Curated annotation (Swiss-Prot):
Recorded name of the encoding gene: copB
Compartments, record wording: Cell membrane
Cystine pairings recorded for this chain: none
Keywords: ATP-binding, Cell membrane, Copper, Copper transport, Ion transport, Magnesium, Membrane, Metal-binding, Nucleotide-binding, Phosphoprotein, Translocase, Transmembrane, Transmembrane helix, Transport
Organism name: Staphylococcus aureus (strain USA300 / TCH1516)
The protein's name in its UniProt record: Probable copper-transporting P-type ATPase B
Length: 674
């Protein structure tokens, strides 16, 4: 199977709000041009009211040609609207298609009556038909829908581009070393594929041979090329920049990064937010409003003028000018655009409600390590406090216990011990002490690695001056305990991310208060916070403390956004009004988090808030346009200003209706991230 085409198809079909529209109505472009062939002679052979031409196209029997061509046009060109109206009524959700179907049906049926009266009745006088209005009406509707479908398609353009990134085939390295080109669908997990410079990486995987720079701009929005070496992860769909590499496949098909992103975005687009449910409800009421106004205007004009032609024209114009569709598409089109732009830039919107809530956020709470800082620790100091143990022995004991952990602090210690050629052993019975550290057996002795809070809580002695000095330098400090005695310590420094300071400044400029939550000691937390400009700091926290702090802030009616690790901070992310999982990488399917930030870049927090602001502004613009248009257009179509000579024909009504939807679509398409 061609993954690219399949994903593209799945994405397109997911535009649920409009897919029915596209589904029943075939190719509007073809229908428009075929209908144009029928419409031209209908218009030329019909008497154009108020237009005096120096020549006539009519001939004896031409009215029969008009009747036949109009009938063909009604059933062929009008079929999308007739079948669409039928489906809307069947689902008990009458809307734009039903209004258009009613309008063209009234025009056609009355024209049949007029044809009979003019050709077979003994009644004197001429009854005006609506054949040329019918022709122009159907033509304009088809043209409008053709343009609209293009605009709707473009709304999710960024996501479509992502869907097309995967190649159709890959070079598989066989067990005997031979290379063979195979379809993407034939690639399995653990296969080895070879990717040359300039080629698209076919699947997610790990580099097992070679090194290169990868262009991930179309996949995650990362503008700079990323250097990749052996054992580094690569994402399917990114471009191999400089060298030939061999990649061991780790995920294929639906498990791949791009497929996961497409699935999450499709799900988000199909879920309706509260604002969209409201607009759908209003759009539903608009149908009944338009029909009521149309019928009332027909009755009123019959009473005023006793002119069935004019009264009927008002009815048809009201039916075709009303556009619940503009209101119904106001939010889905913006959503399709914003979610696809977000995905294209590494911002995966899982919960659409969070885009609306983001406008009201009061606090952004952030974990320190990995969110505000790099999380790449370096050992700056280690020391033994026991005379019979050397500094390197203390380092060995630390490394032995930490070798069983994947925490950034632990990885840093193990790597440092290796770089110093300090040997360490495999401990036994290693257990995690939540919010504190580790404990385990080494040579039948129990050791614990703890933080300073543990020492204070258990009243264990330590060098307070040394701790203060190292902590104020921004070091995270861990202690080694044997038999309730502190026998050693290690201090590790972390770098503040380049974009963290600007992110904090941007939050403050938006009147949003940044809050640091960390399990680290007070001195380190405040040192980092001071450098970043954060005044609200909570340090030495246990994992469950973060959730309770968020709850406390919310109890005063504040809206809280939490940014942290999608796994370790899961309870906090769920508790917050908006949970943002940062640095998810290819694991975008993390359960917690309303928003997934693929990269570990604090700037993306601001990018999300900006995208949210821009999205809501476009939604409001579209809703005002969709509602305002109908409030003005429907009374005009009914003839409320006829006394000053302002009368809209059905054709003008059709043009305005089509334009109203096209304007909504184009406005959605102009949504940008920045």
């Amino acid at each position: 199977m061609n993954h690219s085409n399949q994903m593209h198809h799945d994405n397109h079909a997911s535009h649920d709000h409009h897919s029915g529209h596209a589904h029943h109505h075939g190719n509007f472009k073809v229908k428009f041009f075929v209908s144009l062939i029928f419409a031209i002679p209908i218009i030329l052979l019909s008497p154009l009211m108020g237009v005096n031409l120096p020549f006539q196209f009519t001939f004896p029997g031409s009215e029969w040609v008009v009747l036949i061509l109009s009938t063909i046009l009604f059933f062929y060109g009008g079929k999308p609207f007739l079948s669409g109206g039928k489906d809307e009524i069947a689902t008990k959700k009458p809307g734009m298609m039903t209004l258009v179907a009613l309008g063209i049906s009234v025009a056609y049926i009355y024209s049949l009556y007029a044809f009979y009266m003019n050709n077979f009745s003994s009644a004197t006088g001429h009854t005006m038909d609506f054949f040329w209005e019918l022709a122009t009406l159907i033509l304009i509707m088809l043209l409008g829908h053709w343009i609209e479908m293009n605009a709707v398609g473009n709304a999710g353009d960024a996501l479509k581009k992502m869907a097309e990134l995967l190649p159709n085939s890959a070079i598989k390295v066989m067990d005997n070393g031979q290379r063979e080109e195979v379809k993407i669908s034939d690639i399995m997990t653990d296969d080895i594929v070879e990717v040359k410079a300039g080629e698209s990486i076919p699947t997610d995987g790990i580099i097992v041979q070679g090194q290169t720079s990868i262009d991930e701009s179309l996949v995650t929005g990362e503008s700079k090329k990323v250097q990749k070496n052996q054992n580094d992860n690569v994402i399917g769909g990114s471009i191999n920049g400089s060298g030939t590499i061999q990649v061991k496949v780790t995920a294929v098909g639906e498990d791949g990064y791009l497929s996961q992103v497409m699935g999450l975005v499709n799900q988000a687009q199909n879920d309706k937010s509260s604002a969209e449910l409201l607009s759908d409800k209003v759009a539903g009421y608009l149908f009944y409003f338009a029909v009521s106004v149309g019928v009332i205007s027909f009755i009123v004009w019959m009473l005023i003028q006793n002119d069935v032609d004019f009264a009927l024209e008002r009815l048809v114009t009201v039916l075709v000018i009303a556009c619940p569709h503009a209101l119904g598409l106001a939010i889905p089109l913006v959503t399709a655009r914003s979610t696809s732009i977000g995905a294209h830039n590494g911002l995966i919107i899982k919960n659409r409600e969070s885009v609306e809530i983001a406008q009201h956020i009061d606090y952004v709470m952030m974990d320190k390590t990995g969110t505000l800082t790099e999380g790449n620790f370096s050992v700056n100091h280690y020391e033994s406090f026991k005379n019979d143990l050397s500094n390197d022995t203390i380092l060995s004991l630390f490394a032995s216990l930490e070798s069983q952990s994947n925490h950034p602090l632990a990885i840093s210690i193990v790597d440092f011990a290796k770089s110093k050629n300090v040997s360490f052993t495999n401990p036994q019975d290693v257990n995690n002490i939540p919010g504190v550290g580790l404990e385990g057996l080494i040579d039948n002795k129990t050791y614990k690695i703890t933080n300073v809070s543990y020492l204070d809580k258990h009243k264990l002695n330590y060098d307070d001056d040394l701790f203060t000095k190292l902590a104020q330098q921004g070091n995270s400090i861990s202690y080694l305990i044997e038999d309730q005695q502190v026998i050693g310590m290690i201090a590790q420094g972390d770098q503040i991310k380049e974009s963290s300071k600007q992110m904090v400044a941007d939050l403050l400029s938006r009147n949003i208060t940044p809050v640091m939550l960390t399990g680290d000691n007070n001195e380190v937390a405040h040192a980092v916070a001071k450098e970043l400009g954060i005044s609200d700091v909570h340090a030495q926290l246990m994992p469950e403390d973060k959730e309770s702090i968020i709850k406390d802030y919310q109890s005063d009616g504040n809206k809280v956004m939490m940014v942290g690790d999608g796994i370790n901070d899961a309870p906090s992310l769920i508790r917050a009004d908006i949970g943002i999982a940062i640095g998810a990488g290819t694991d975008v399917a993390v359960d917690s988090g309303d928003i997934i930030l693929v990269k570990s870049n604090p700037s993306d927090i601001i990018h999300f808030l900006t995208l949210s602001n821009n999205t809501m502004r476009k939604m409001v613009q579209n809703l005002w346009w969709g509602a305002g248009y109908n409030i003005v257009a429907v009374p005009l179509a009914a003839g409320i200003l006829a006394f000053i000579g302002l009368i809209l024909s059905p054709a003008i009504g059709a043009i305005l209706m089509s334009l109203s939807t096209i304007i909504v679509a184009i406005n959605a398409f102009t949504l940008k991230l920045k």
